[in-house]
């Protein structure tokens, strides 16, 4: 099921700073939607920040599971937008996932589609990893959120907790990360929580929010098996 994570939304925007796990969250949710069926699933990689982990690095995996992957190759440093976004957003038969860069630059790119990203059909998810440096205080996060959401001309959003230290994340890391999340946002609950799929069965009795199992798809070869605990 996907409704516990996105409700009735068909257009989902993913925003978050580098290291938040934004792309992994978007990729795993896209794969889940493809398994559920009922709608064609379109994934638009709009992250122009050239981070180490990008959705386009797992294009083959997405396509293999029936997700149509879209991105526009950059020419030098010129910002580009993949074609077909407006059509997909309007199409009732399509679920659309927009993976947007964490900076205002990437957010400006989707600002042109802001009129199509309104109402209950759209869900804006702001991914927070409380272990990342710029998640050190609520003020830091709110400054980033205001900057990014303002540039994208988006209003309401939901927080997603993604407490992780990379491939070596443990169950204790997740619960400690959720404690930190609670300190950052004492009056709010995350819409859902992300955790490595092998940890979810143990966490199910300790986490009250829906758990989205994460299978790492964008870990580069040099990091696999390295024992490093970072994204």
Annotate each PLM feature.
Residues 25, 29:
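Hydrophobic positions on the alpha1 helix immediately C-terminal to the Walker A/P-loop
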């Amino acid at each position: 099921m996907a409704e516990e994570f996105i409700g009735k939304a068909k257009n989902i925007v993913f925003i978050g700073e580098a290291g938040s796990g934004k792309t992994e969250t978007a990729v795993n949710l896209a794969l889940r939607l493809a398994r559920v069926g009922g709608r064609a699933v379109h994934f638009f990689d709009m992250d122009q920040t050239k981070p180490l982990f990008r959705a386009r690095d797992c294009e083959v995996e997405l396509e293999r599971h029936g997700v149509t992957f879209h991105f526009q190759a950059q020419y030098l440093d010129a910002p580009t937008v993949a074609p077909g976004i407006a059509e997909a957003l309007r199409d009732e038969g399509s679920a659309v996932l927009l993976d947007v860069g964490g900076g205002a630059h990437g957010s400006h790119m989707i600002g042109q589609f802001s009129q199509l990203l309104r109402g209950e059909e759209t869900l804006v998810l702001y991914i927070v990893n409380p272990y990342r440096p710029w998640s050190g205080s609520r003020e830091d996060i709110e400054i980033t959120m205001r900057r990014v959401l303002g540039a994208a001309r988006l209003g309401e959003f939901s927080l997603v907790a993604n407490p992780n230290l990379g491939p070596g994340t443990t169950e204790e890391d997740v619960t400690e990360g959720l404690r930190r999340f609670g300190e950052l946002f004492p009056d709010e609950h995350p819409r859902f929580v992300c955790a490595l799929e092998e940890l979810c069965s143990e966490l199910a009795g300790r986490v009250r929010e829906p758990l989205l199992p994460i299978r790492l798809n964008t870990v580069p070869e040099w990091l696999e098996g390295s024992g490093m605990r970072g994204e």
